[in-house]
């Protein structure tokens, strides 16, 4: 692409981007928010231009054009600085769809232009995606998504991608479903690609991307690839389809649509569609050659995003959907071939009042000046340069076998999930039986078609051979001048040959009609009627299955909700049981501590009482000792007193040991108290003895006094008598 053309495209795409953002500027973010296919294509176009400009000598030109575009009269550069505000309170400032789109696109574009080191890109994207998570958590806009362009992805290591994936996988409250799916795809794709020789490669400019599995449209949009880019595939991949365009919405709704696709027969394509800016452009890769167990995106519900983004399904809730039969196969675009002429001046069948959809399209070919060819009816199959224009669904007969296999696989899966005794067991068995019968009939029809084609080839060869013989006979006839019998014989042979040729032509015409009926024609034939009946039956079964799937989805949704409630209740019950066990442990420990405290308190009170009693007893013992000492001084026989004193000292030592040990045996204390009582009794007895001794001593003293008085009186009397006698 020349630079001038790139700058012109960038100018147009920047204007389209500014117009789209301005239109969405006041749409508040919510759980129903999502980007339409038109908006996603506008974003892809401007990011592609910036990516392509990186390989030119004016790589900042496209980015400057984008920055100078205006939104509501203000340049995008200034608007971006205002809503970004240096990363302060971003989730409150970016509250509409338009601001969200502007914020993401400008961040990616600036990163593409200014960053080339993987660590720098990773650091920027880490901060950026944390802001995105904050926005999604605040507004619950789970269907909003603008993925990383391929120009940045190719610079990141797998470790960086896994770390960015963890930003979303650990932020459960962010509701960034599509970002999580995007990084999950990159992770799965990396490990599958590293261990496989199978690949599908898409490239434009300086970027390329390879994958061995199906690639959904929103992944291709995020990576900024289009169906006009260079596509390559490995030779082992046979059933590869590239979806290129949305034809119309199905059943007048936007929940599903009919798409055009190209089957990739060749290993390399310089684009399979024209490079346009149409709003209904689509690009997705369907790979039916790889094992379905490793390809989670071949399901049509996941491969092609509905127009209303909030109606898209997640992998966990997506039912098997392979309605590829409704989509239209078209030929790959070749820029070297002239475009077909659509205005021929010939009145089309629908112009006469017929239905355009039901009328066969007539192809008008340029007249040939050759006289012989002019009088012959033109047979397109004999024209080697004939390229048919397909106006409705054209699926190879062999692909019906693939679809039937998928339907049987789907029914087997439904039967496994519903169980052997499920409600729909009979319907499933009936559907499988009819599919098996249809498969057998289809195989029979295929064999008949192949036989007819072989017969057609044989008849064609025979016709060519007879034509050659007729021409030789004509030459012989024209070369004879006489009227011999050989001329009559030759005429007869020619007539017979012509009759045989007419019969062969008639047979060939019938065969061609039958083949046209099988492929795409409207000629009534047995095979056509059978196929129409089978299609009607398949559609009816599809409707029935869809209704049952809706019922099942509702039941599963309710069951899932109940399971979540039960799981939460179980979790709360488990937490409650743990709390009860913890409380019980604490109560037990508190009771133990209270009993120990009470015991210690009782022991302390008892010890205090015992100490007081011991102090009192000590004082009493000391008093007894003092009295015993006094008694000892007043009594000559001190043997019993010494025994009591030693016994008291012994008791005192025991009491002292008891006090020093911080307590004592209450029984021993009681015994000691009783012993002390005995000692007190003995002491009292001793006291009684001392009193008696004192009384006796006083009596002795009195008697001694009387004796002394008596002695003195006797001495006095004796002296008196002696004096008297002398």
Swiss-Prot record:
Keyword tags: Late protein, Repeat, Virion
Chain spans, region 4 X approximate tandem repeats: 426-713
Additional detail: Some orthopoxviruses such as cowpox, ectromelia, and raccoonpox viruses, form large cytoplasmic inclusions within which mature virions are embedded by a process called occlusion. In those viruses, A26 bridges mature virion with inclusion bodies through interactions with proteins A25 and A27 on the mature virion membrane. In camelpox virus, the protein A25 is deleted in its C-terminal region and no inclusion body is observed.
Protein name: A-type inclusion protein A25 homolog
Record-stated family: Belongs to the poxviridae A25 protein family.
Gene3D superfamilies linked to this entry: 1.10.287.1490
Basic and acidic residues composition bias: residue spans: 347-360
Gene Ontology biological process: viral process
Function: Structural protein that forms a matrix surrounding the mature virion (MV) through interaction with protein A26. Presence of protein A25 in the virion structurally prevents direct virus-cell fusion mechanism.
Species of the source: Camelpox virus (strain CMS)
Subcellular location: Virion
Sequence repeat spans: 612-634, 639-661, 667-689, 691-713
Subunit record text: Interacts (via N-terminus) with protein A26.
């Amino acid at each position: 692409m020349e630079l001038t053309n790139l700058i012109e495209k960038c100018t147009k795409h920047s204007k389209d981007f500014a117009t789209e953002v301005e239109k969405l500027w006041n749409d508040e973010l919510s759980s129903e928010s999502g980007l339409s296919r038109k908006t996603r294509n506008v974003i892809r176009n401007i990011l592609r231009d910036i990516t392509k400009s990186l390989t030119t000598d004016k790589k900042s030109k496209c980015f400057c054009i984008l920055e100078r575009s205006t939104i509501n009269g203000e340049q995008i550069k200034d608007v971006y600085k205002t809503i970004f505000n240096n990363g302060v309170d971003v989730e409150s400032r970016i509250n509409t769809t338009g601001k969200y789109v502007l914020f993401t696109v400008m961040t990616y574009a600036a990163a593409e232009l200014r960053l080339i080191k993987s660590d720098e890109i990773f650091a920027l994207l880490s901060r950026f995606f944390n802001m995105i998570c904050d926005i999604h958590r605040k507004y619950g806009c789970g269907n909003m998504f603008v993925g990383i362009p391929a120009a940045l992805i190719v610079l990141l290591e797998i470790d960086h991608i896994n770390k960015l994936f963890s930003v979303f996988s650990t932020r459960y409250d962010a509701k960034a479903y599509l970002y999580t799916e995007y990084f999950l795809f990159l992770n799965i794709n990396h490990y599958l690609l590293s261990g496989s020789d199978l690949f599908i490669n898409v490239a434009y400019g300086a970027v390329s991307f390879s994958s061995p599995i199906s690639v959904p449209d929103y992944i291709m949009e995020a990576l900024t690839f289009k169906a006009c880019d260079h596509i390559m595939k490995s030779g082992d991949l046979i059933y590869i389809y590239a979806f290129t365009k949305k034809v119309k919405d199905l059943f007048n709704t936007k929940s599903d649509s009919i798409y055009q696709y190209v089957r990739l027969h060749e290993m390399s394509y310089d684009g399979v569609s024209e490079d346009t800016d149409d709003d209904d452009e689509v690009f997705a890769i369907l790979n039916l050659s790889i094992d379905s167990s490793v390809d989670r995106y071949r399901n049509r519900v996941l491969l092609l995003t509905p127009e209303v983004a909030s109606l898209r399904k997640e992998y966990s809730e997506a039912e098997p959907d392979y309605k590829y039969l409704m989509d239209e196969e078209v030929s790959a675009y070749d820029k070297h071939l002239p475009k077909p002429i659509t205005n021929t001046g010939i009145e089309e069948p629908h112009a006469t009042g017929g239905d355009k959809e039901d009328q066969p399209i007539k192809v008008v070919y340029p007249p040939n000046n050759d006289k012989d060819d002019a009088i012959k009816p033109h047979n397109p199959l004999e024209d080697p340069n004939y390229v048919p224009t397909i106006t409705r669904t054209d699926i190879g007969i062999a692909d019906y076998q693939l679809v039937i296999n998928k339907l049987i696989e789907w029914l087997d899966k439904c039967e496994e999930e519903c169980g052997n005794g499920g409600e729909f067991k009979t319907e499933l068995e009936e559907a499988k039986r009819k599919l098996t019968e249809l498969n057998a009939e289809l195989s029979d029809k295929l064999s008949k078609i192949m036989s007819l084609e072989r017969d057609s080839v044989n008849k064609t060869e025979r016709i060519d051979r007879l034509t050659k013989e007729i021409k030789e006979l004509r030459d012989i006839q024209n070369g004879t001048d006489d009227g011999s019998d050989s001329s009559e014989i030759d005429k007869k042979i020619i007539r017979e040959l012509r009759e045989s040729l007419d019969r062969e032509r008639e047979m060939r015409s019938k065969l061609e009609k039958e083949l046209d009926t099988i492929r795409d024609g409207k000629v009534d034939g047995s095979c056509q009627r059978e196929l129409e009946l089978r299609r009607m039956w398949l559609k009816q079964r599809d409707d029935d299955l869809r209704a049952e799937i809706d019922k099942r989805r509702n039941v599963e949704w309710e069951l899932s909700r109940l399971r979540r409630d039960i799981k939460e209740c179980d979790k709360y019950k488990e937490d409650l049981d743990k709390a009860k066990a913890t409380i019980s442990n604490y109560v037990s420990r508190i009771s133990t501590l209270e009993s120990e405290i009470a015991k210690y308190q009782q022991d302390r009170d008892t010890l205090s009482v015992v100490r007081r009693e011991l102090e009192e007893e000590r004082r009493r013992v000391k008093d007894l000792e003092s009295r015993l000492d006094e008694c000892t001084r007043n009594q000559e026989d001190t043997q019993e007193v010494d025994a009591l004193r030693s016994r008291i000292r012994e008791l005192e030592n025991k009491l002292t040991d008891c006090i020093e040990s911080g307590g004592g045996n209450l029984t021993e204390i009681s015994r000691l108290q009783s012993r002390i009582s005995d000692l007190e009794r003995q002491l009292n007895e001793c006291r009684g003895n001392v009193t008696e001794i004192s009384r006796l001593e006083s009596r002795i003293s009195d008697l001694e006094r009387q004796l002394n008085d008596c002695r003195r009186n006797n001495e006095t009397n004796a002296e008196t008598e002696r004096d008297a006698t002398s």
